[in-house]
A protein has these predicted regions:
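EF-hand Ca2+-binding helix-loop-helix modules
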Residues: 291-312, 323-331, 343, 348, ...
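Structural microenvironment flanking redox-active thiols in thiol-disulfide oxidoreductases
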Residues: 1-50, 62-64
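Thiol-/selenol-based redox modules, centered on thioredoxin-like
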Residues: 12, 62-159, 277-282, 286-288
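A short acidic/small-residue loop/turn micro-motif
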Residues: 74, 91-95, 197-198, 270, ...
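Acidic carboxylate motifs that coordinate Ca2+ or other divalent cations, activating on Asp/Glu
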Residues: 314-318, 336-338
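Extracellular/lumen-exposed scaffold segments
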Residues: 126-293
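Generic structural signal for well-ordered beta-strand positions
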Residues: 86-87, 190, 263, 322, ...
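Structural recognition of the beta-strand scaffold that forms the well-ordered cores
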Residues: 14-19, 55-58, 88, 322
Length: 353
């Protein structure tokens, strides 16, 4: 992408990266931010590490841009000077982008190569020792739940709670609830294992949680930065309604050994899927040979979703959707600009993505 930028920025094409909700929290050691300031710190750090020349924009914590542009985690858009989207892809493709720009703006020869750009790899943030505490092995797919965080005393969220539910709990109210405490590398802190492990307390009405009091493992190493993970059983929950009140207590120590302080965090967790919560790659189930199951081809999956989206919005089944009634990417598929999106236009729009 940086190579394409160098070729087409002089031609007046403006490029932007947009930071959105993390699709896979934990990748490269990055923990999902809890506020906008933390997102901006991620942007600053990533830009410095990569040596990027392309400017960055940052979505707000309500993820309005992500929602408006179709929710794809790695999407790509070309917008003309009048504000019209002339090309879009649910998955960024630099080679196809270069072809589009060659057609729209003109071909550039010779092309800048990746080697000429000399980008630095995005290494994980430096932390205290990891690999000390074994990770929790989960069976089946887990889904992130909606979490609202509160912290007593105004301290940063040195550790961040992630809560996930299995399919049975999310749909039927009975199942397993995963809780993970992840130290945020932004704050350069570690667990002080000499003063005791983190503690978690779960309070909920008319729902049974076993156990409802949790304590992290005893660790011989004096410090580490591994996640603290727990799995509890839930019975008689109400999907979409049950609220878990969760209190977390731990001692945070900075890596420079300038402070150690007790921290209390409070969370409200709703038994409902967080559409912006992403998925942890380390939590995805693996096949017996240790590999993750193959997923459907991205293009096939996109066309399946596209057909479903059009069918859902075409309520009278006449093959036409009024543009003002369209949502998400359908808003941009009115190729002849007559105020309507036909099934044929939608197919052509998706073919170009």
């Amino acid at each position: 992408m940086e190579a394409i930028y160098r070729d087409y920025h002089p031609k007046g094409v403006k490029f932007f990266y947009i930071y959105k909700a993390l699709a896979h929290p934990g990748n490269n050691g990055y923990v999902a931010p809890f506020d906008h300031e933390e997102r901006l710190r991620h942007v600053t750090e990533i830009k410095e590490k990569l040596g990027s020349d392309i400017p960055w924009l940052c979505d707000n914590m309500s993820n309005n841009f992500k929602h408006a542009m179709g929710n794809a985690p790695n999407s790509e858009f070309i917008i003309d000077p009048k504000g019209k989207i002339v090309s879009s892809r649910s998955w960024c493709s630099p080679s196809e982008l270069r072809e589009d720009l060659a057609e729209l703006v003109g071909e550039v020869k010779p092309e800048t190569t990746e080697a000429q750009v000399g980008m630095s790899p995005l290494d994980p943030p430096k932390t205290a020792a990891t690999g000390i505490v074994p990770r929790l092995k989960l069976e089946g797919r887990m889904t992130a739940l909606e979490v609202v965080s509160r912290q007593a005393g105004g301290e940063p969220f040195f550790a961040k709670l992630r809560v996930e539910a299995d399919e049975s709990l999310l749909k039927q109210g009975d199942g397993q609830l995963y809780l993970g405490l992840f130290l945020d590398p932004l704050y350069e802190v570690h667990w002080n294992n000499q003063v005791g492990p983190p503690e978690v307390e779960i309070t909920v009405r008319q729902t049974e949680v076993t156990p409802d009091r949790l304590r992290g493992p005893a660790v011989e190493e004096p410090s580490d930065a591994d996640p603290r993970e727990f799995l509890v059983a839930v019975k008689d929950g109400q999907p979409g309604e049950t609220i878990f009140d969760i209190t977390v207590k731990y001692v945070a120590c900075d890596d420079k050994e300038t402070f150690c302080k007790p921290v209390t965090q409070e969370y409200q967790v709703k038994l409902a899927r967080d559409a912006d919560g992403g998925s942890r790659r380390d939590a995805m189930p693996r096949s017996p040979n240790g590999r993750r199951p193959r997923q459907p081809q991205m293009q096939d999956l996109n066309f399946q979703r596209a057909r479903t989206m059009f069918h859902r919005m075409d309520r009278n089944r006449d093959g036409v959707i009024q543009k003002q009634e369209a949502r998400g990417p359908l808003q941009w598929a009115d190729l002849d600009e007559n105020g309507e999106v036909t099934r044929e236009e939608w197919r052509e729009f998706m073919r170009r993505r």
